[in-house]
Amino acid sequence: MANTQGTWVMVDAEIGTQGISTVSTVQNHPFGKIVRAKDVGATDYGEGEFIYVKGVASGAVGAWAGYEVEAGAQAGATILAVANGNYPLGLMVSLLDATTDFGWLQISGHGVGKALTLFGDNGVCYLTSTAGSVDDASVIGDVIHNAKGANGAANTVGDLAGEVDINRPYCENRVSLTN
């Protein structure tokens, strides 16, 4: 059974708001804008939060991405998450595959993210050397805080995606309590 993205509809949407799964080549919102949305599809993932960002070369649906929300030249920038990262994380819910694309990353709720291996319910998520993907192999400094596997038993490794529960996940490349 393949894992699929939810059918997200904004809660309390404003007129002119860019849809959650919509990619635009025009910046429609300030970077860092956070909205809530509800999955109204058969996947029934409940509610989640999403943050507005720029795309990144090689971005893909389900990719884990680090993002920057501070003002300045890097505002809204994303990077495909990779081992030894140090940034807040989100899941791409649309094909943000260029720095001229604008859209949303999921930062809380039940979602689907790229995974190199199938990890079980409540499994810890770790960054990998494969950009944008995670697995459950314990590596010092690569743990993703506030993220856990939520696959259940019905999913297969072949779809290279895993269901996860996230709550504003982040990584910090911390290898000891002194660094």
Stretch-by-stretch model annotation:
Residues A2-N179:
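Glycine-anchored, exposed beta-strand/edge motif detector
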